[in-house]
Amino acid sequence: MKKRLISLLMVLTLMVSLVGCAEESTSNEGKSVKQDVTVAWDIEPPMLDPTLTTSTAARDINKYIYEGVVEMDANFEPQPQLAEKIEHNDDNTEWTFYLRKGVKFHDGTEMKAEDVAASLNRWSGINGSAKLIIKNGEKFEVKDDYTVTIKLDTPCLLFLYYLANPSQFAGITKKSIVEAADSSSGYKSIIGTGAMKFVEWKQNEYIKLEKFADYSAPSAKLSGFAGDKTVNFNTLTFYMVNDASTRVAGALADQYDFVNKISYDSMNQFDGVTNCSLTQGQYMIGGLIFEKKEGCGSYSEDPNFRRAVSYALDINEIAKAQVPNSDYVTIDSDYMGPFQTAWDTNAGDAYYNKHDLAKAKEYLAQSKYDGGTVKMVTNTEYPDMYNGTLVVQKQLEAIGIKVEVEVMDWATQLTRIN
């Protein structure tokens, strides 16, 4: 009998995410700015529906297209974006969103409360976190053209944090687009209120965006994802370049202005290149995802099996496979990351990276594991995930778990996870 364990790998890493190499032209503000910007992008997103997909490749492109009623600032605090003002009662069950007037969608129509309510009601039925707080069919209601309300059955102090979460983002689009959306493939039209509008998607080649001349920015300066997102260039084209060495070569040859996900052993190629700059950003490399829904028939339903896996893992060795240069990785129990100061905690230290084969075998013997095959799912588009999975396979086999690794493309893996 085959059981299944869907798997990604987690370490907290400091990742070199972007290289910028650009020739410049002069803008009307007197600053040197290139007007047609090109990016070599590592992964083609499965869709450009901000609410339906969990893909970071989609999220980072969608942030130019869509906005939310609130967005996260640089300190990971939610701030009004399409909302002008937000009010709530003392127990955080009744929320009122007063919308900014005159905000236009990319088709030229004005955003109204019916669009916001439709978008947020769809979000609340899809987003996993939203389902934890909107459990009993509560709905966002239209009070007037510029006011949306919701009454929660359960108090939620963190409601705005859920709304501002960039994963499965509560991006606002037209009511008609929400109503026509497909439950699997998402929105049929890509229209938001963001600083750039969608122009063209040529599969396996590029996604092109264009500056939205009628963009209505909030008064606050840009901080994180919140505030004025006005761009000072005309077009932004994301070219799908899966191979990391090809992205590097393209940057060095001035084929692309920006390149993401530079491999650690390629960074020295930019030493002395005066028109290029490296930007480093912290991000999390996935996490182990167990299929453990009650009744699914997976070994992962058993807490002792999961404990056995935890003690079998040597995170240090996994990290070496994922990030060869130790200068760019931090191993930490903190799920959110120390850079998110509001959420930083060491609560998991007692259980994290406690590699102990004897304890692992002890828990495995107490579990329901009967010698069957555990399946791990991974992909090669993200080398850190693939390389880490192979190390985990060896570590689990070392305590007597039979492991089969299934490799698929990232879009298919996301579908399996969802």
What kind of region is each of these model predictions?
Residues 5, 196, 326-366, 380-385:
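Structural transition elements
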Residues 40-90, 121, 191:
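N-terminal lobe/hinge region of extracytoplasmic solute-binding protein
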Residues 41-59, 82-83, 109, 157-169, ...:
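A structural "hinge/loop" feature
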Residues 74-77, 166-235, 245-246, 358:
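Gly/Pro-rich hinge or "lid" segments in bacterial periplasmic/extracellular proteins
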Residues 91, 132-178, 195-202:
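Surface-exposed binding/hinge segments that line
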Residues 217-269, 402:
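Ligand-site clamp/hinge motif
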Residues 299-340, 384-388:
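Periplasmic-binding protein-like
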Residues 361, 365-418:
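Ligand/substrate-recognition segments at binding pockets and active sites
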